[in-house]
């Protein structure tokens, strides 16, 4: 151990060390567990280059201003490696943070957790209990997989998580959580998600991360009625957080069709998903090549997706809808209420048809053959939402600007959007299940009085594979958006530039 001031110390761990050593740089410990048993508030544990085949389970907390830090030694890569660990059940993660306060993890690789059984959830990171003031920064989480090939007789499917944050205490939420500059990839999560926040979780920031090449949903902010079914419903949902500046791509069932072809959900992986949560902002993200882009939905009979804002995002080249709102068709639970979808740029989504073939839903809708879910999709029970100031740029022949499937829902406001497509075949909208190809007719049924149609927003590049969705200096979207209250529009655009310029705001994500 090397002293670092009166109140903190540095500890060193190396694969070649010995737990009988004193933990100094010259005489490092061998296991992370040995170091974590010695740390005090303010201490830092440096992991030297190499793999550590152990579960990391902190038992001591830091204090305000004295975080405990676990990190790779500068210039080296330490791996928390589950290759030789026995991983069964749920919660048996490579890194387990339970009832811990004031701790941060930096520049670690957390990898290689596998199992192939139903009802087993390999996890990279599990944060639970009453944990608070936890940071993961600059970490890579990858190759976390459940490879169970088939559904069993009980209907159990495979599950895994790169990161699972689950607030289970009704009195003390998981709080002040920061996950930033991390990378998540190569995850076989089955019917779960790569990165999940659920249950009693408040005041979280998920920013500047990259989530890609996973077989299902990338990031979900959710209620806890599934994973924490006994929780107090008044607090059993993630809330008061932000998901910003993340790059989310290739979250798709196409990654493992050998598995997903068995499921009615095949093709439904969402990049960023809000589900039964509250008061969450999703902003400045780039979401592409997912089955669906961003979702504000609910699969719950107890919890709505409510009071959320999706703004200033680039959403493009996704296989199905760009932004999805509402409950599943035929679902009679709760849905999406009092949410804002504002100042986003949607481009060339719906590269494939939808999931409905005319036989698998009560309305006998077919959005698969020569059709699509729409750049923005409203399904069941959407209430009191706002869809405004978005650039909606349709390209594929099957595309639709906005598709509202049913007559359910009420008091949704639509306005201030630009609808454009160079292809006349997709100059269409759908409202309450009926198609409209005339803009005036669309305005009459939807109440959309302030949007414009067939005006090219002049994006910098509409090259399909790598578009540049920023605006040219002559764009008609500049300075023509509707002005909303500051908490709705936010301070910055997709690039971090000032959003409102001399009381003028652009349409789309770019100011």
Model-derived regions, located:
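C-terminal accessory segments
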Residues: 441-511
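Acidic glycine-/aspartate-rich tracts in secreted/extracellular proteins
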Residues: 16-20, 50-52, 74-76, 351, ...
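Right-handed parallel beta-helix
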Residues: 67, 73-77, 101-112, 132-145, ...
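Acidic Gly/Asp/Thr-rich repetitive segments characteristic of extracellular carbohydrate-active
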Residues: 15-54, 442, 495, 499-500, ...
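Short glycine/acidic-rich loop motifs that flank beta-strands on beta-rich extracellular proteins
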Residues: 52-58, 82-85, 89-93, 114-123, ...
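Predominantly extracellular beta-rich ligand-binding scaffolds that present long acidic/polar faces
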Residues: 55, 59, 281-287, 302, ...
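Bacterial Sec-dependent N-terminal signal peptides
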Residues: 1-10
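Extracellular beta-strand-rich solenoid/capping regions of secreted or surface-exposed proteins
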Residues: 33, 37-44, 53-69, 79-106, ...
């Amino acid at each position: 151990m090397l002293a670092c001031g009166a109140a903190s110390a540095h500890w060193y761990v190396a694969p070649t060390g010995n737990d009988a050593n004193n933990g100094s740089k010259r005489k490092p410990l061998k296991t992370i567990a040995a170091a974590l048993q010695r740390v005090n508030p303010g201490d830092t544990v440096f992991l030297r280059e190499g793999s550590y085949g152990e579960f990391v389970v902190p038992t001591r907390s830091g204090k305000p201003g004295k975080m405990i830090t676990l990190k790779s030694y500068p210039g080296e890569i330490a791996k928390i490696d589950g290759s030789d660990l026995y991983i069964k059940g749920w919660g048996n993660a490579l890194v387990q943070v339970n009832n811990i306060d004031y701790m941060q993890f930096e520049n670690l690789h957390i990898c290689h957790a596998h199992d192939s059984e139903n009802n087993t959830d390999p996890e990279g990171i599990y944060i639970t209990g009453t944990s608070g003031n936890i940071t993961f920064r600059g970490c890579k989480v990858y190759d976390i997989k459940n490879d169970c090939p088939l559904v069993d007789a009980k209907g159990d499917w495979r599950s895994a998580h790169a990161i699972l944050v689950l607030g289970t205490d009704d009195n003390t939420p998981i709080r002040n959580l920061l996950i930033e500059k991390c990378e998540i990839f190569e995850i076989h999560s089955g019917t779960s998600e790569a990165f999940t926040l659920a249950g009693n979780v408040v005041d979280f920031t998920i920013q500047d991360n990259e989530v890609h090449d996973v077989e299902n949903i990338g990031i979900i902010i959710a209620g806890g009625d599934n994973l924490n079914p006994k929780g107090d419903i008044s607090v059993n949902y993630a809330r008061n957080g932000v998901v910003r500046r993340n790059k989310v791509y290739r979250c798709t069932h196409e990654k493992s069709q050998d598995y997903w072809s068995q499921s009615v959900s095949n093709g439904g992986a969402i990049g960023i998903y809000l589900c039964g949560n509250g008061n969450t902002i999703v902003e400045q993200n780039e979401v592409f090549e997912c089955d669906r882009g961003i979702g504000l939905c609910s699969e719950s009979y107890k919890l709505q997706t409510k009071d959320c804002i999706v703004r200033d995002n680039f959403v493009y080249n996704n296989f199905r809808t760009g932004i999805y709102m509402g409950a599943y068709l035929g679902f009679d639970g709760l849905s999406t209420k009092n949410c804002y979808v504002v100042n986003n740029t949607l481009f060339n989504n719906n590269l494939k048809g939808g999931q409905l073939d005319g036989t698998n839903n009560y309305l006998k809708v077919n959005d698969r053959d020569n059709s699509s879910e729409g750049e923005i999709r409203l399904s069941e029970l959407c209430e009191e939402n706002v869809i405004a100031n978005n650039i909606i740029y349709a390209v594929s022949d099957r595309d639709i600007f906005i598709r509202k499937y049913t007559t359910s829902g009420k008091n949704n406001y639509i306005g201030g959007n630009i609808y454009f497509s160079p292809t006349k075949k997709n100059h269409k909208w759908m409202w309450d299940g009926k198609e409209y190809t005339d803009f005036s007719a669309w305005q009459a049924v939807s109440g959309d009085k302030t949007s414009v149609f067939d005006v090219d927003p002049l994006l910098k590049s509409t090259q399909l594979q790598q578009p540049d969705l920023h605006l040219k200096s002559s764009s008609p979207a500049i300075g023509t958006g509707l002005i909303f209250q500051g908490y709705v529009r936010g301070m910055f655009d997709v690039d971090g530039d000032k959003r409102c310029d001399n009381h003028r705001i652009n349409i789309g994500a770019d100011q």
